[in-house]
Amino acid sequence: MINDARTDVAAHAAWRVADAPHPAALDAPEAWAYHGIAEVERLSMIAEFGDEDLATRAIDLLASANHENHMRRRRIVAVEDGPDGAPLVVGHGVAHLWMTSNPHLAFVHVAVRPSHRRRGIGSALVQRLREIVVEEGRTTVIVDADFASEPDAASEPVLVPPTGSGSVAAGKPGVLLAQKNGLRLELVARRSVLDLPLPEGTAERFAAEARTAAGSEYRVHTWEDRIPEEWLGQYADLETRLTIDEPNADLAIEPDPWDADRVRAYDAQHAEAGKGYLITAVEHVPSGELVAMTMLLYAKDRPEVSEQETTVVLPDHRGHRLGMLVKAVNLQAHARVRPSTRRISTWNNENNPHMLAINVAFGFRPAGGAASFQGPVGG
């Protein structure tokens, strides 16, 4: 993503790169950029994965921009004049900037409308993002390249990260762009999809087996859309723990502290975006401590799909099948709350075999993934 060429790519005969305005509401005149970004994301997801299950919506962009105490975003758009003279977003880029940790780091994402690829738009967006990252004083950048299926090494060149887990086709446009700009493949994550409904009794059986393995020292709690006040601090501790334990290989991601205020800020952001969630957590009864949790997140205007988010078990309580327990109980709750959902998507690092094994046991199937590239801003 990062070379030192200083050619002027902010404008082109057919399109131009500009900062994305932040509207007060989605019906405001300035909302054209957020609506356009959402359409680019939708078309890009369909082109790569064949579905729009995980495509960012305009309301997601608005809600995240309204809640930036912990993560700030600098958004840019590539725009051309549409048939009616209105701006048409043909590509976009964003630099995600941690505000309470990782002051050295920017996570960068670029997407171009499929009909407008191979015109230099992606390179122009990358160059402008490089300038933004430098302006923000960040020294390291991470970028992901999505792919719909793991490549066949026997039939095409592939790249394998230093972890030795997973691979990505060397000829993918996102891979080529990352390498062109001096970034190195560090990690591959797997996207998995669980088709619903599960065979009758599946979640119940896994939950019963896990409860037996856990024993009487553990109590399960399930919450919808809001975590009770008395558990906020301990829930925040679990989120923090995930940032310590997640197997991120050599990605330069430092622990990211959570507290009760941050949890409530994300509650507010989810509510503003029209999202709901289910969290199942496990309490260690003798100590009164939360020691495991998992979350399912969903957009309420997308009844057919949900996302499996965070799952974490504290190190001292591993080996009791608590990861299986929280997921099984949460899936039972999800079946009651979201009976029309037909798919759950999730992402796991390929070097996390334990969590992948739990997902496979439930019936999650591989559905592509993402390759994470990293490098210095100066390339």
Predicted regions and their residues:
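A short, internal acetyl-CoA/4′-phosphopantetheine-binding micro-motif in the GNAT/acyltransferase core
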Residues: 109-117, 147, 283, 310-319
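Long, mid-chain structured domain cores
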Residues: 89-92, 99-101, 107-114, 122-149
